[in-house]
From Swiss-Prot:
Residues 37-136, 144-239 form the Fibronectin type-III domain. Residues 386-564, 609-788, 835-1014 form the Laminin G-like domain. One of its GO terms (cellular component) is basement membrane. Its main location: secreted. Disulfide bonds join 347-358, 352-369, 371-380, 534-564, 569-580, 574-590, 592-601, 788-799, 793-808, 810-819, 987-1014. It comes from Mus musculus (Mouse). Residues 343-381, 565-602, 784-820 form the EGF-like domain. Residues 1-24 form the signal peptide. It comes from the Eukaryota. The keyword Disulfide bond applies. O-glycosylated; contains chondroitin sulfate and heparan sulfate. This is Pikachurin. Disruption phenotype: No morphological abnormalities. Knockout mice are viable and fertile. However, the terminal of bipolar cells do not appose to the synapse terminals in the rod photoreceptor ribbon synapses. The signal transmission from the rod photoreceptor to the rod bipolar cells is less sensitive and is delayed compared to the wild type mouse. The signal transmission from cone photoreceptors to the cone bipolar cells is also impaired. These mice show reduced visual function. Impaired stability and postsynaptic targeting of GPR179.
Length: 1017
């Protein structure tokens, strides 16, 4: 017996026991103290599986209420089986009670009532109310994040970053969880960190020399996404490889050095122990402890215990400290000031704002709050886009330790100094200059390059001093004990370290512009001050380092870093829709839209032969001519181009929701064709490098996952994409010569730089991409130096580039090299016969749209007669069909293919092809008659006799709406489905339809191209 039945029986017995004349049952119930129903009940669906309910305390609650019960059941179900209850205890002095009922079915209606309980039993039920949980599609979890990118930092650390998936589901993403697996050891995934509220992190405590894969899940209010595609397998560094330095400010160590320490090397203390007093979030897995650092969290050393919190109302007393004046910084109009705030207390007592961290300042006493990399402003609350870092004397940026540099390295740095002293570079075995290290510092405007292989310091000093406010380039080179410093391509200065050790152990990050422990580096580097000024470029061992914050660039962390180009565009005046972009720390360019050029996009021009320049960040874009499904299994590009540099993207398109892409690049002088069907990348590379400054013909194609590449007359290269997928879908434009954002390209696309050079022809699946009509967007695309740019073709003729030269396609009525001669009915008016005999040159055609002509090349019957001569084995004589052709489109054609004369037609149910073999390309006149009656066809050529054929299927009518072409047609390969690749090379003297309808070839034509007079040449 349930609770309700028990109370019902109790009150029924009470009523029956009353003597005659006693009060009524209702009065008895009231006097018994039965509690009334809860009041003001409110219901609301929370999600797919839960609803919320709220009510007020009943009015008549003479006895104290000890609890409530919520009764709920699915509407329309068997109540005795489906009704469920949920008990709710009473809080102290609570007039309004709220509760959440979960574990429900999505999109289901529920009936809900509430009853209160007192010491005397259950009160009366509230009036039933209804609520419906949200439908399933309203409660979707996020899509799986994109495949994470992993960077190995050391033998026990990796840096991880990822991007959200295609959609965030039915609610915003709240957090991520990160998992790992060791493919060589583990069979299941291990969770490292849950509820991570950023898209990058650093994982510490990994096993050295071990393979790892990482995956990410996203979570919103409705649950977790599927696991992302696992990262590529990475291997942590081995003990003999680059040092195991930590990452970011958390790498700062307890100095353990008193202020009177002489900084000399202690042979017993060469291996520094790195310790963090304030531990990062950690998760224990077995006996292994993994610590996690996010890019948004910075930690001080053990003496500098950072408190990353907002200042309280009892604000700290800020002390004015006498700091030596620094030269005026070159800031843009809207640059963000870097506020490194100095306090008169240690980090143990200092409170720093969010996005900042505390470091004890041993030089001036007290402590400083430093802004994290990418943050600035007085409260470190402003975002800073860093490309050319600016340093203020207390700033620094960290990169991964120098790799493969223990024996030799080369570093090139371009900088502009605003103060005479400061540390530019440091990397070593310890944070404080003990043991092995290398450094570059400014000391009284001279550059000091120092390194120590473990038995003595080499000091190499530039012979000339730098000029403050001017740009300088310095190159450092070391091989074993020997070092070299070269400033501004001047005479190199050399030196040698002491002792016999010739290798350097690099464990710390590579610091640029300063170091968190610069105070302790004075003995090693010669200065305890940070650099003041800007850095424009940094190269290590011949590779340019992207100084943007990771994961876009290689900068792992930093403090109080500004952007040198900030405000550079404030005074720029880019017109005609141009936008400003910094290309150096102190200069900008205008990104001019198509059709404009110049310093400020002030010059309008007609784009003819596009010229792309890497220095101008050029690119153009054109949509795919047809829907993506037309290119799923087959794509072919023919490109004629002239490269001016050995690297750059020629063409690129991709799919935003998958791994699909295709790209054509210049790479080290070769052409690379890359494509991915979603299961692996295929890479085809030309056998020989291309000659720069010359025109080249390129053809690439892919059928399913098989690719072909051919450049000029080089050997054809074939290759195959990995995996089992065979289709490519690209939903973006086709980008030519560059892309708008190089951070968004697929990682295996090989796209690194814009193309420098010219492109004069692009044909996609036989369809020409026209520069004037098909380019829809782009920036800084100019005209190449080419004859077509000068519009040499007169009378409306169009210039067709042919590498260094050109050809003119002349309109009907004009001929000559530049369409300068008027012809047609007037050019040879002394020879009447010549007017009627047009000459075709392979890219010529005549077009007819007269209804009296068209009706004779359609319907149930057709009869055509021609007299022609030609010197080519291939060429189209006649064509009428749908444009563009579709599968089983109606058409009728007559032409030469490989020397044979072929009459073809399709009535909608299959193609009929009737062939006559012979020597028809002998330059002599030939007569051909093609007749069709329903499905049956016949062709007669000279005296060769008739050949007959029949089209398959049941269709008997030729239904066509297009024009009639004679001698060729526009984009012939495209519109004939590659049945013909060129027009007639020769002449046509007679053309008759329906046995007696004679057509004047030139006079009756509505349009034509490249028609000369037969016999004139």
């Amino acid at each position: 017996m349930d609770l309700i039945s028990t109370f019902s029986l109790h009150f029924l017995l009470l009523a029956c026991s009353l003597p005659p004349g006693a009060v009524s049952l209702r009065t008895a119930l009231r006097k018994s103290g039965k509690v009334g129903p809860p009041l003001d009940i409110k219901l609301g669906a929370l999600n797919c599986t839960a609803f919320s309910i709220q009510w007020k305390t009943p009015k008549r609650s003479g006895s104290s209420i000890i609890g409530y019960t919520v009764f709920y059941s699915e509407v329309g179900s068997d109540k005795s089986l489906r009704e469920r209850s949920h008990n709710v205890p009473v809080g102290q002095d609570t007039l309004i009670t709220e509760e959440v009922i979960g574990d429900l079915k999505p999109g289901t209606e529920y009936q809900v009532s509430v009853a209160a309980y007192s010491q005397t039993g259950k009160g009366r039920l509230s009036f039933p109310r209804h609520v419906t949980t949200l439908s399933q599609d309203s409660c979707l979890p996020p899509a799986a994040p994109q495949q994470p990118h992993v960077l190995v930092v050391s033998d026990s650390e990796v840096a991880l970053s990822w991007r959200p998936g295609e959609n965030e589901g039915s609610a915003p993403i709240q957090s991520y969880s990160v998992e790992f697996i060791r493919p060589d050891f583990d069979k299941s995934w291990t969770i490292i960190q849950e509820r991570l509220q950023m898209d990058s992190m650093v994982i510490k405590g990994l096993d050295p020399d071990t393979n790892y894969q990482f995956a990410v899940k996203a979570m919103n209010a409705h649950g977790f996404s599927p696991r992302s595609w696992p990262s590529n397998t990475v291997r942590t560094l081995g003990p003999g490889e680059a040092g195991s330095g930590h990452y970011g400010p958390g790498y700062i160590t307890n100095p353990g050095v008193s202020e009177d320490d002489d900084g000399s090397e202690d042979e017993l203390d060469l291996d520094v122990s790195f310790e963090e007093v304030k531990p990062l979030p950690a998760t224990k897995v077995g006996n292994k402890k993994f610590s996690v650092e996010s890019k948004k969290t910075s930690v001080s050393n053990s003496v500098m215990g950072s408190r990353l919190a907002q200042p309280t109302s009892a604000s700290l007393h800020e002390t004015t400290v006498a700091i030596p004046p620094t030269p005026a910084q070159r800031k843009g109009k809207n640059s963000v000031a870097m506020m490194s705030r100095l306090f008169d207390m240690s980090c143990d007592e200092t409170l720093c704002s969010a996005d900042s961290f505390c470091v004890n300042d041993y030089a001036w006493g007290g402590s400083r709050c430093h802004c994290n990399l990418g943050k600035g402003g007085e409260a470190c609350s402003e975002d800073i886009f860093i490309q050319y870092p600016q340093f203020f004397g207390h700033s620094y940026v960290t990169f991964e330790p120098l790799k493969n540099s223990y024996q030799a390295f080369q570093v090139t740095l371009e900088f502009r100094a605003e103060a005479e002293d400061g540390l530019l570079l440091y990397c070593g075995e310890s944070e404080h200059g003990r043991g092995d290290f290398m450094s570059l510092a400014l000391i009284r405007r001279s550059l000091h390059f120092r390194f120590n292989c473990g038995t003595g310091i080499a000091i190499i000093i530039s012979e000339t001093k730098i000029k403050l406010g001017a740009w300088h380039t310095v190159t450092l080179y070391r091989d074993g004990l020997n070092g070299m410093l070269q400033l501004n391509n001047g005479t190199p200065v050399t030196g040698q370290s002491q002792g016999q050790y010739s290798k350097i152990t690099f464990r710390t990050p590579l610091y640029l512009g300063g170091a968190p422990s610069a105070y302790w580096l004075v003995r090693a580097t010669g200065t305890n001050r940070g650099f003041q000024g800007c850095v424009q470029s940094l190269s290590v061992n011949g590779k340019k380092i992207d100084m943007r914050p990771w994961p876009l660039g290689k900068a792992l962390n930093g403090a109080d870093v500004g952007e040198c180009s900030s405000g550079i565009c404030d005074e720029a005046s880019c017109i005609h829709g141009g936008t400003c972009a910094a290309i150096k720390a102190d200069s900008y360019i205008c990104l001019c839209p198509l059709g404009f050029r110049g310093r400020h996009c002030e010059d309008a021009f007609a784009l003819t032969i596009p010229q792309f320049r890497e220095s101008l960040r050029s690119y153009a874009a054109t949509p795919w001519p047809l829907e993506p499904q037309h290119y799923l299994s087959f794509t072919e590009f023919e490109i004629t181009f002239r490269p001016d540099s050995g690297d750059g993207v020629l063409l690129y398109s991709y799919d935003t929701g998958s791994k699909d892409f295709l790209s054509i690049n210049m790479a080290a002088g070769h052409v690379e064709f890359r494509f991915d069907c979603g299961s692996g990348t295929g890479v085809l590379r030309s056998e020989a490098p291309l000659t720069l400054g010359q025109w080249h013909d390129l053809r690439v194609s892919r059928t399913a996952k098989n690719g072909i590449l051919q450049v000029d007359k080089q050997k054809v290269v074939e290759g195959m994409a990995e995996g089992g997928f065979t289709q490519i879908k690209c939903n973006t434009d086709i980008f030519i010569g560059g892309v708008p954002n190089y951070d968004d390209v697929k990682k295996n696309s090989g796209i690194l730089h814009p193309f420098s050079g010219s492109i004069q022809k692009i044909i996609l699946n036989d369809r020409t991409i026209h520069v004037k009509h098909d380019f829809t967007s782009g920036v800084n695309v100019e005209n190449a130096a080419h004859p077509c740019v000068g519009a040499p073709c007169a009378h409306g003729g169009s210039c067709r580039p042919r590498k260094e030269g050109y050809e003119c396609d002349c309109p009907l009525g004009f001929e000559g090299l530049n369409c300068q001669k008027e012809c047609g009915n007037h050019c040879l008016n002394t020879i009447i016969e010549a007017i009627e005999i047009p000459q075709f040159i392979g890219r010529s055609y005549l077009t007819y749209d007269n209804p009296n002509i068209l009706k004779r090349v359609s319907g149930s019957r057709s009869n055509a007669f021609m007299r022609f001569k030609t010197t080519a084995k291939d060429g189209l004589l006649l064509w009428r069909g749908d444009s563009p052709m579709r599968p089983n489109s109606d058409f009728i054609s007559l032409g030469l293919r490989d020397g044979a004369l072929i009459f073809s037609y399709n009535l909608g149910s299959g193609v009929a092809s009737i062939m006559v073999n012979g020597s028809f390309s002998d330059g002599r006149w030939h007569r051909v008659k093609a007749v069709r009656d329903g499905q049956s066809g016949k062709i007669t050529v000279d005296d060769y006799g008739a050949r007959t054929g029949k089209s398959p299927g049941l269709m008997r009518q030729l239904n066509i709406n297009g024009a009639l072409y004679v001698g060729g047609m526009k984009e012939i390969a495209l519109h004939t489905n590659r049945q013909y690749l060129r027009g007639l090379v020769g002449c046509i003297s007679h053309f008759t339809l329906s046995t007696d309808y004679h057509i004047s070839l030139v006079e009756d034509a509505v349009d034509g191209k490249n028609i000369n007079t037969c016999g004139a040449k």
